[in-house]
Structure formats: C-alpha cells, structure tokens
Amino acid sequence: VKNAVIVPQGAKGGFILRKVPTERDALAAEGIACYKIFLRGLLDITDNIVNGKLVPPANVVRHDDDDPYLVVAADKGTATFSDTANAISAEYSFWLGDAFASGGSVGYDHKAMAITARGGWVAVERHFREMGKDIARDAFTAIGVGDMSGDVFGNGALLSKNMQLVAAFNHKHIFIDPMPDAAKTFAERARLFALPRSGWNDYNTALISKGGGVFERSAKSITLTSEMRTALGTDAKTATPDELIRIILKAPVELLWNGGIGTYVKAASETHEQVGDRANNGVRIDGAELRCAIVGEGGNLGFTQRGRIEYARKGGRINTDAIDNSGGVDCSDHEVNIKIALGAAVAAKRVTLKARDALLKKMTDEVADLVLVDNRLQTQAITIAQGQGVSLLEPASQLMTQLESEHFLNRAVEYLPDSKQLAELRSTKQGLTRPE
C-alpha cells in the first residue's frame, strides 16, 4: 500500500554478515564491504540502458521482460550507505547514476527535511481536526515511543509547541513528566534534538514537573508518585520498567506518537509469538486496552494490522504505518524521478552536473510540499470512504472479489473481512475501519 503513491513496485532485500567484528569501526567496514557485494550482485543481473538502448547483462538467462529500473532505498542499518551504493552504480555505468540510491550527499536529507514526521503530522492534525480541535492553537497531551535523537520521533515532537509530552520511552530509558509546561519542554526537546546521539537521560530534570523523572529500563523496580499515577491513570504504587511501559501505552492521553522500532500493540486474538517481535513481548498490549484518542504511526510496524482494527473498532482514530509514514518513500521517489529527468540533459551536456545539483537543492521545499499534498489527499480519501459507512460495504466487497480474482489481493493476508464477516457488519450497521 505504501508504494501506491510512487512509481515502482517494492520488495524487501537484505544481506547477512558472516563475520561480525566486535569493534565498532571494524563492524561498520565489514557491513559496507558486504553491502557492496550485495549491490554488485543485484546489478550483475539487472538490465542497463546505454546510449538510449537497453543492454541486458552478459551471461544471464532472462525469464522476464526488459526491466532496467532498480533503485535501492535506505533502511534500518543502511541509512547512511547511499553514497556507497551510488559509487557502485558509477562503477557499473548504471544508467540511473546517483539516482540509484536516494538521500545521498547529492540528494534529499530526510531527517533535515523532517519529511517523514511532517507527513505523519498531516495525519495527526486531520484526526484532531475531525474531533474539532486545532493543535496549532490548543494544547494537547501525548505519549511517545522513541527519543529526540531519532528522525521520526525527534522531528515529530518538535512540530507543535502545544504538545504536552506526559511520557515516552526508548530502549534504554523511560521519561515521565506528569504536568508538562508546553513552552519549557518544547525548548528542552529542541536542545536534545540538536545534541548528537542524545537520550532521555540527557533531559534537564529541573524542567520536569513535580513527581516525574527519567528512569533506567534496567532498574529492578520504579516507584510511581501520586502525580505519575494521576497522569497515567493507574493505581499501581510500584512497577517494573516493563510494567511501567505497558501503563504508559494505556495512558488516557489524546495522542500516541510512535517514532520507535518494534511492535507494541497487537489484537487480543493474537499471541505474542504471532507478532514476531520477541524483544517487545514484555511490553506489548492489546488494541482494546489503548485509551488514547489518536495514534500517529511515524514508525513502521508499531501495531499489527489486527491491533489497529481492534483499536479502531472501539473508537480510536488510526490509519496505518504505510499511510502515515509514506513521506520518506514519496520523497525518495520524487528525487529519483527528477534525477532521471535531468540525467538525459546532463548526458547530452546541456546541463552540467553542478547546475543539476544546485537545481535539486533549490527544489527542496517544493518537493516537500508535493509530498505533503499526497499525505493530505490520502488521509482525506480514507475519511471520505469512512464517512460512507455501511453503504461502502457492497462496492468494497465487489472490488475485493475482483482484485482477488486477478491475484492482486489476498484478504486473509491483509485481514480484510470475508463475505460472512461483511454480512455481520451489515447486520450490525458497521462500516470498514480506517485501517481496513
């Protein structure tokens, strides 16, 4: 679904390090060396374009049609490898040049543009607007997954000066501020965002309201003050760090902003084993247990799809990660398409590479605006569809049947209702949820 707003189809690829050095620099060097092997392997079997003509790879039996389009996207672990990938592209004289890997030194820096978080924030603002609240003007309470050094969480937590961040956690620390002062805490979050590799332990505790604090996730037990209990809506006097994270996730706040890594919400009908994220089994809750009004999914896979549906069925406002965080993928796609368009002019020596680079940089704000239009329109489309309620079930059913017959859709994989479940929805006068 995330690739619906862009040109290519997507696939996940990866590679495994056979030798894993313990020393940090050696590990990075080994990772890059293996990344190069992986990319050369891909380009060895990819069609190229030379002087406008398609050239298949040598000594390769091709079972598919001509297909020279291959781009690689930065992901967890390879986020800083774009220049390395583009050097391999140059080594192979690959037709895409430095459009092969977006976001390199001559490309759009997603974190500097805050594009993924800004796209997710478009969705958050829509949810609030549909509840009758303008968060550009009014204060709102929030909890978060992530920390200020992260692109999605950090940028997201700086998109409104009215955010009252009650609690947040990352893999090392838990931050709790029961009665936050929006102005003071915004300035402190901005300081942490600018501080390289900052964590919640770097937060100036003098700015935390009475009864709050920053706690280690390695602690045996944490005492919950009366202020913490009120803010988080719990009677527990003490809790282990894992128990406290579950309490935070269930807090009665307006927004849950997820900018972290891991799956924290499943459906009651799912087991932890089915989720496939063992590291977070101890902190995961069910969708029906959430008490926040809105979820913004800046990070990937924060919820299972069933968890989203369960939360939405009890009145929660949520889209999906693919909708909320499509900004990064969308921005990369714009970059690649602009580079392809200008590539022919550069090759024909009508434009110098330096002039192309200057033009790319000049277009940064315009590209961001175009990406955010997609975020606005796709969340609007979901709202319009949701507004049709029960009347949408029949056309949706026909569309699903058609897509299944053409092998574009597998309802079971996407957790979409079958004909029996659709009949139940009709009889109880319920439409599809936003995630569906």
Please tell me what each predicted stretch does.
Residues 1-9, 14:
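Segments forming glycine/polar-rich beta-alpha architectures that bind adenosine-containing cofactors
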Residues 9-10, 19-20, 157, 268-269:
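Short acidic-glycine loop/turn motifs at beta-strand connectors
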Residues 14-15, 150:
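Short, surface-exposed loop/turn segments at secondary-structure boundaries that line and modulate
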Residues 16-39:
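Short secondary-structure subsegments characteristic of cysteine-rich extracellular domains
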Residues 32, 36, 43-65, 78-436:
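Non-transmembrane, aqueous-exposed alpha-helical and coiled segments at domain scale
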Residues 68-69, 73:
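Conserved anion/nucleotide-ligand pocket segment
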